Amino acid sequence: MLPDDSAAIIGSPGRLFRINIIATVLDLVAEAWKSVRKRSDIDNSSNEDTIAGALYQELWEEWKKRGMDGPPRIENEVASRSSSSRLLPEGFIDFRFVYHWGEQDFFGMECKKVSSTGRTGKYLAEEYVNEGVMRFVTGKYCSGHDVAAMLGFVVDSNIAGSVGLVQSVLFNKQYVAKQSGQWNISKLFGNHSNLYETTHQQYGQAFHMTILHLFQEL
């Protein structure tokens, strides 16, 4: 759940507005993903950046199809810093969905491939947590934000098994990930069958951050 709005939280113009923006983003992703799956240039062997690039193209196509003339503005592979004092980026977040003019007025999403199959599945689950979830927790991505998202590209058609592996890795790292509470089904942002949420205390912040986890079969 989103915490109450606070002046200490970056990118928070209003609770209801943000809920609507995030719900819109997730709906756009779900619809655009159907088009990604139909593309001849994308398959299970495609790397994460290529898949995210295809999704970026299809997101804009879906945005145009709906005749949208307002937020969110969709950005792909954007430099990210944990502090405005840093000259060099600490990473490049896969997506920023911008909803206002301020530097931090966006909803961030990072993408990772996941699988339930053998050593590959375990490795990808660890990457999902270590190079995805932890980038939000440490503030490398979305520093000062109270909500962000992970998008899992399921490459072996087993969503439940892939989710289970991610849960297991995150459970074993819950202290470092500063996780509070359980892995829960998320219901605030629309009816998505494979949408979950976890709650973390971002390093250096007094409030908690909700990380959404959406899984889509490739």
Model-predicted segments: where are they?
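Nuclease-adjacent, charged terminal/linker segments that flank catalytic cores
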Residues: M1-N20
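Acidic-basic catalytic patches of nuclease active cores, encompassing PD-(D/E)XK
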Residues: A23, D27-R81
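A short acidic (Asp/Glu
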Residues: D49, L55, T120, A160-V166
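Extended hydrophobic secondary-structure segments that form protein cores and membrane-embedded regions
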Residues: P72-A79, G108-E110, M150-V154, L212-L214
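Active-site metal-binding core of divalent-cation-utilizing nuclease and nuclease-like domains
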Residues: P72-F107
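Short, flexible loop/turn elements at secondary-structure junctions
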Residues: F97-W101, C111-S115, V154, F215-E217
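Catalytic cores of nucleic-acid endonucleases
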Residues: K113-A160
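Non-catalytic C-terminal interaction segments of nucleic acid-processing enzymes
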Residues: V169-L218
